[in-house]
Curated annotation (Swiss-Prot):
Belongs to the RNA polymerase beta' chain family. RpoC2 subfamily. GO terms for molecular function: DNA binding; DNA-directed RNA polymerase activity; zinc ion binding. GO terms for biological process: DNA-templated transcription. Zn(2+) binds at residues 225, 299, 306, 309. The gene is rpoC2. This is DNA-directed RNA polymerase subunit beta''. It is found in: Plastid, Chloroplast. In plastids the minimal PEP RNA polymerase catalytic core is composed of four subunits: alpha, beta, beta', and beta''. When a (nuclear-encoded) sigma factor is associated with the core the holoenzyme is formed, which can initiate transcription. It comes from Rhodomonas salina (Cryptomonas salina). Binds 1 Zn(2+) ion per subunit. Keywords: Chloroplast, DNA-directed RNA polymerase, Metal-binding, Nucleotidyltransferase, Plastid, Transcription, Transferase, Zinc. DNA-dependent RNA polymerase catalyzes the transcription of DNA into RNA using the four ribonucleoside triphosphates as substrates. Its cofactor is Zn(2+). It is an enzyme of class 2 (transferase).
């Protein structure tokens, strides 16, 4: 092959292996890194052709026969079921709590599933290595171990839509087929996958958008920033597993310092050298465990990253070009796998897999020996077993059957399940090392419900009362203990029931225990619903009182009626008519109007002023329908016509004081209806009202000059009356107009109110209860002196029929009934007060087994007295037994406990000495006499010579810090909540945690339950107090210490004597990065200058954030290069918050770039001014985007109005440094070919490149090329000297750049 290379590429190696996916990857990577894109794609094409050629010759197919289920499965399932039955027995004996049982079941099935998976692989490997499924899955062609496991192993445990694990596993696989239950549980988990995929695609897209926005202006702008800092790289480890080996992390990095071999001190690699695959491999092989490299995190370039700090462009395996937009590449690299992560859950169909703990299994049958000096602490495992936690690391002795000694190392924190000299079987779990960080735990509660009814009994249960913030009393169990439910039948009785039994009485089956009565409060006439059978009547009505009008009939008013709303008229025998204001079926209350008299006697023709003359009104009973008139008198009415207009005064066609005739135009299209004098009411040149006052003008005489006496009413018998030359009562007021003032004499219309009676003949249904009556009443509708604004007439007074109720029963309401008379369409009015009584068939609770009998004690139309019993309900005993207790639980209920024959069991002990005493609690499986085992749990009630009587019961173990819902001696029914257990559980670790967790880290959110962080570095001492609280003390080298008190609930992840670093977590949970930054900064600022302290504190948090993001992606087997995350994290940690501006122009609370504030402070030092004080801050990606220097970029991201307004107020300038700003205003972006921000690229650099060309290039220049050689790509192109005269060329470029700048 004739090639034009600056270096001789390595010769291809012969790979004598099965070429599976992994090997193919290696081959392609080799071709790409040595020969560039073009040749690598050519090779890929050739391999594809080769693959297809053979695919047509032979292929693999899947058949049912290939799905081989390992024969050990049946045995494994049998073993697991036995273990689960054992756990259930423990639970029934009250040895473990319901939570521990659940946890044990889940772990047991999970381990069984894992074991079966290993069996499947082993079975294929040993018996059928050419099995098509095995070949496909393990060559990497299609499928993975998880899917194979579901096909031929067992589907295992599934999670429900809330992410909680269902404790019923799917034991079958797809080869055997699923049962209906299996299928439904399966669909449950799979549906979750589908929904999640749909939702998370959007989440992932939004994450990418935010990342692009935060990093879009990071461009490679210079070659070397000459930084004096680097970061330390070593293997990335989590849970004792190497996630990313050092070799992979070094690839494409630039060294910060020259590396020497640890053995020979030879130079392995030079400072500023970029590391390729071979060098990285060589460094690791030479035994170097950690290397300091250049990193975007420590780059000193302002608002960019330099070539050396960034390292390789991973797309072509060589140093990144100037002008490369690395920010966008970083954002896409982190955002893109988000969509893949979403697909992960979907394919496994929600199958739960979790490496819950690393188990240590016994290598053989044997015995364990524990030394005397052994330091352990007794704990209760999550399965409710007692075990020891090792406080230090130990090597323990295990002896096999031939007494040969073997040593096994147990690390600190290991849980040991065996005691000294205890025997164990091969592959038995003897210890467990919990994986502390990867599992996300959450605090949850679970209700403990009783499975049978009976009496609550506390056994060794210590309780304490607490008052919570709301003032409620809470009973909780600080230590835990046992709670027994001693069985018996519980009956719930309402407090009003009449109990017919006494304690210790024997009751027969179907005997009446209690009776509840339905009583009528008022008495009256009984009405039963005819259609109902007496056996199941649910309600009956009692007519307490009823009144009817005998001398009036109701007819339908056809003129006013509509289909939906009929109108009725009440006609009296004397000819008076009333309009009905209520319909049949309406409910009316005291003083409510029934009907209104049809009458025009008190109607006016216009508006006016109302005056009362000689009568009183009832002020108390004011309602919407006016005031009730007491006595006789007259209403005086002074008519006037009021027009309410809202118009400009210039539009008015009349003026103040003008006398007009009827029909005069006041404003356009508005005419007066009466004649009179005009009064105008205006406000701010706007006419509100025009009033036309009828009357005549009267020139005031000299004698009457008292202006305060007007307006007034003058009657004909008044001494001054003659002066006014009028007829009838008059109303005098002043009149103002242009010429001057005069008096206006207005006519007064008098409406007489006489005391005429309306004769109502009322008839009462019962002789005793006359609670209600119908009475007529007159009401005046306006107040004394009120102005009625109207141009049309109004009614001044109305006569109503109202319902009146006895003053001692004001709450009664009556039903309106129209009772048909003898003729059609004619009705009589009845008002009836009804008492509706509910007759509940289930007065004693819902329970099916409780039998009740209800009987009626009255007949239809029977007249009963107040307080009479209407119906009775009897509660019958379900089975015969003794009344154990009658328990008044609260004001409303009372509970009765009856012990039946089935609740007590007798056990023959055949003259043996009993090993128990009366009152003891025993559990099933306990020995009660020599050779006699109790089959049921319960309490010993009686011991006779030959018999022991046991009252059966169920024990429930209550864990510590549970909240009790019952008290000792309470009676409970099946399904009642006994206690709320508080516990920690691990969430399933699928990507449901992935994306939100990445978002949480990158948005720098405070975790919900953050872990406690150490305030100083030092040595830990752990103590436990009596309350089971843990006291942690961290002692530093200078003798100072910090103390932390932890409650029993918080899980501690450090151990005694351990050395801890600054800001390391002490308890379980995710650390709060803001707190971490604060701790580091406060610690460093006491020991070094402010700038250095801020830089170092930020660097610590940066490295933590990078590792956290990597952890999440690695848990899903997604590889992302560190440098991409570093670029994003650099943007999150570039700002500081000003605390005190000193003599600078900065304000407290302002966010400034760290480098910028340091430059300002340096200037202050020179001018002897006071420098600014600040503290570093961690901003989430959204906040960083909004706080960027460019307001155009920030506004195009979120909160456009706010950003632009603030920028305008502050008078900001946008320097257009990033890509986004330039795109928005339509300029060339400053990346790639548009990169012209820096023109001081050293000329010698280009010369150097030219001089590096080897002679082989000159020789090969004129030789012919093969067809395969006309493949040019970036990697090769950069090695060609495409510039004939580099110096002249460079000058031309420089001129062009300068010209474009001038333009």
């Amino acid at each position: 092959m004739k090639e034009k290379y600056l270096f001789i590429p390595p010769k291809p190696k012969f790979t004598n292996k099965t070429i599976d996916k992994k090997e193919l990857k290696k081959l392609m990577a080799w071709a790409f890194s040595n020969y560039g894109t073009g040749r690598a794609s050519y090779l890929a094409d050739k391999i594809k052709d080769l693959g297809f050629q053979y695919a047509t010759k032979a292929g693999l197919s899947l058949s049912v026969e290939d799905l081989r289920v390992p024969p050990t499965k049946r045995e494994l399932l049998k073993r697991t079921n036995e273990e689960i039955n054992l756990t259930q027995q423990k639970y029934e004996r009250g040895e473990i709590t319901t939570v521990e049982r659940f946890q044990k079941v889940i772990d047991t099935w999970n381990n069984a599933s894992e074991e079966l998976k290993d069996e499947v692989v082993k079975y294929f490997k040993e018996t059928d290595p050419l099995n098509t499924i095995y070949i496909m899955a393990f060559s990497g062609a299609r499928g993975n171990i998880s899917q194979v496991r579901q096909l031929v192993g067992m589907r295992g445990l599934m999670a429900d839509p809330q992410g909680q694990i269902i404790d019923l596993p799917i034991k079958s696989n797809f080869r055997e087929g699923l049962t209906v239950t299996d299928y439904i549980i399966s669909s449950y988990g799979a549906r979750k996958g589908l929904v999640d995929t749909a939702l998370r695609t959007a989440d992932s897209g939004y994450l990418t958008r935010r990342l692009v926005d935060v990093a879009q202006d990071i461009i490679i702008r210079e070659i070397d920033c000459d930084t004096d800092r680097g970061i330390l790289l070593k293997d990335m480890v989590s849970n004792n597993q190497i996630l990313i080996p050092l070799q992979n992390r070094l690839l494409g990095r630039v060294l910060f310092e020259t590396l020497h071999s640890p053995d020979s001190a030879n130079v392995i690699a030079h400072i500023n050298q970029d590391l390729d695959h071979n060098t990285a491999e060589f460094i690791v092989k030479s035994g170097i465990k950690s290397v300091i490299v250049r990193s975007p995190l420590t780059c000193e370039s302002s608002r960019s990253v330099c070539q050396f700090c960034y390292g390789w462009n991973l797309a072509h395996g060589s140093l990144v070009d100037l002008g490369e937009a690395v920010g966008i590449i970083a954002a896409q690299s982190i955002g893109e796998p988000g969509t893949q992560l979403t697909m992960r859950t979907f394919h496994t169909g929600g199958v739960f897999t979790g490496e819950l703990a690393e188990q240590i299994r016994a290598p053989f049958d044997g015995v364990l020996r524990i030394p005397k000096s052994f330091r352990t602490r007794l704990i209760r495992t999550r399965h409710g077993e007692e075990a020891f936690v090792l406080e230090d690391s130990y090597k323990l002795d295990l002896y096999d059957s031939s007494y040969k000694k073997h040593k096994i190392e147990f690390k600190q924190g290991t849980i040991l399940f065996l005691n000294d000299n205890e025997q164990f079987k091969k592959s038995q779990v003897i210890g467990e090392l919990s994986t502390k960080s990867s599992m996300i735990t959450e605090r949850v509660t679970k209700d403990l419900n009783t499975e049978n009814s009976g009496e609550v009994c506390f056994s060794n249960l210590y309780i304490e009362e607490k008052i919570d913030r709301q003032g409620n009393s809470i009973t909780n169990t600080p230590k835990g203990g046992c709670l027994w439910i001693l069985s018996g039948e519980v009956y719930n009785l309402p407090s009003y029931a009449d109990i017919k039994i006494k304690e210790k009485q024997f009751v027969e089956e179907d005997e009446v225990l209690a009776t509840s009565k339905v009583i009528s409060d008022y008495g009256g006439l009984v009405r039963l619903n005819q259609s109902n059978q007496t056996s199941n009547i649910t309600e009956l009505q009692i007519v307490t009182s009823s009144v009817s009008l005998d001398n009036a009939t109701i007819v339908t008013d056809d003129q006013k009626s509509t289909n939906s709303d009929p109108s009725y008229t009440l006609e009296m025998e004397c000819g008076i008519k009333f309009h009905m204001l209520c319909s049949p079926g309406n409910k009316i209350v005291n003083s409510q109007i029934i009907a209104e008299l049809i009458d025009t006697k008190y109607q006016t023709s216009t508006g006016g002023i109302v005056k009362y003359d000689g009568f009183e009104v009832n002020k108390k009973n004011k309602n919407k329908k006016g005031y009730e008139i007491l006595g006789e008198g007259a209403l005086l009415w002074i008519p006037e016509e009021t027009h309410e207009i809202n118009k400009d005064i210039s539009l008015l066609l009349v003026e103040e004081g003008q006398c007009i005739t009827a029909g005069t135009q006041i404003v356009k299209e508005l005419y007066s209806l009466t004649e009179g004098y005009i009064q105008i009411i205006q406000e701010n040149e706007i006419v509100k009202e025009v009033i036309v006052k009828p009357g005549k003008e009267h020139v005031r005489s000299t004698t009457s000059n008292n202006l305060n006496e007007y307006p007034k009413i003058v009657k004909p018998n008044d001494p001054d009356y003659a002066e006014y030359n009028a007829q009838g009562t008059i109303y005098i007021e002043e009149l103002h107009y242009k010429k001057g003032n005069a008096l206006l004499i207005r006519p007064v219309i008098e409406f007489r109110i006489d005391n005429e009676k309306i004769d109502l003949k009322t008839n009462y249904l019962t002789n005793e209860n006359h609670h209600i009556t119908i009475k007529p009443t007159k009401r005046v509708l306006f107040k004394d002196g009120q102005r009625v604004k109207s141009k049309y007439g109004v009614d001044l007074l109305k006569t109503y029929l109202i319902m009146s109720v006895d003053f001692d029963k004001p709450h009664l309401s009556a039903d309106v009934e129209f009772v048909p008379a003898h003729e059609d369409d004619i009705y009589k009015l009845h008002l009836t007060v009804l008492e509706t009584l509910q007759i509940k068939q289930d007065d004693f609770g819902e329970s099916k087994k409780k039998s009740t009998i209800t009987s009626l004690c009255v007949k239809q139309n029977e007249l009963i007295k107040a307080g009479s019993t209407v119906a009775e309900t009897h509660l019958l005993a379900h089975s015969a037994g003794f009344v154990q207790s009658i328990n008044q639980t609260s004001q409303s209920t009372c509970k009765v406990l009856i012990l039946t024959n089935s609740d007590e069991k007798s056990i023959d002990i055949y003259n043996q000495t009993p090993q128990v005493s009366q009152g003891d609690f025993i559990r099933s499986g306990d020995q009660i006499a020599n050779g006699i085992i109790a089959e049921t749990s319960g309490q010993i009630v009686e011991i006779e010579t030959n018999k022991i009587k046991i009252r059966s019961g169920t024990p429930y173990l209550v864990s510590s810090n549970a909240i009790l819902q019952v008290k000792n001696g309470n009676l409970v029914e099946t399904g009642d909540t006994l206690a709320i257990l508080v516990f920690e559980r691990s969430k399933t670790g699928d990507i449901v945690q992935g994306l939100p967790r990445i978002e949480e880290i990158l948005e720098a959110r405070k975790p919900k339950e953050p872990s406690k962080l150490s305030q100083r570095p030092g040595k830990i001492t752990l103590n436990y107090d009596s309350e089971d609280n843990k006291c942690i003390r961290i002692l530093s080298s200078n003798g100072e210490y910090n103390e932390y008190i932890m409650s029993g609930i918080q899980k501690i992840i450090v151990s005694n004597g351990e050395n801890i670093l600054l800001a390391e977590p002490i308890t379980d949970g995710a650390p709060n990065p803001h707190e971490m930054l604060g701790l580091f900064f406060n610690f460093y600022k006491e020991r070094m200058p402010l700038y250095e302290a801020a830089k170092l504190a930020l660097q610590k948090v940066q490295i933590y954030l990078v590792n956290e993001v990597q952890n999440v992606y690695q848990s899903q087997n997604v590889d992302i290069s560190d440098k991409h995350i570093e670029v994003i994290v650099r943007q999150m940690t570039s700002k500081v918050k000003v605390e005190d501006g000193g003599d600078t122009t900065l304000l407290p609370g302002e966010l400034v770039e760290l480098q910028q504030i340091e430059n300002i402070n340096e200037a202050m030092t020179l001018t002897k001014g006071l420098p600014a004080r600040y503290s570093p801050v961690l901003l989430g990606i959204t906040k960083s985007s909004l706080n960027t220097d460019s307001f155009i970029s920030a506004a195009s991201f979120q909160e456009t109005t706010r950003v632009l307004t603030e920028a305008a107020i502050e008078g900001k300038a946008d320097w257009l440094r990033g890509l986004k700003e330039n795109v928005i205003i339509g300029r060339l972006i400053p990346a790639g070919t548009g990169f012209n921000s820096y023109n001081d690229i050293s000329k010698s650099f280009v010369l150097e490149k030219k001089n590096q060309m080897p002679d082989s290039y000159e020789q090969n220049q004129n030789e012919e090329q093969n067809i395969e050689d006309i493949i040019l790509d970036d990697n090769i192109a950069r090695n060609y000297a495409l510039i004939e005269n580099p110096i002249n060329n460079f000058d031309t470029i420089e001129q062009n750049i300068n010209q474009s700048k001038d333009i």
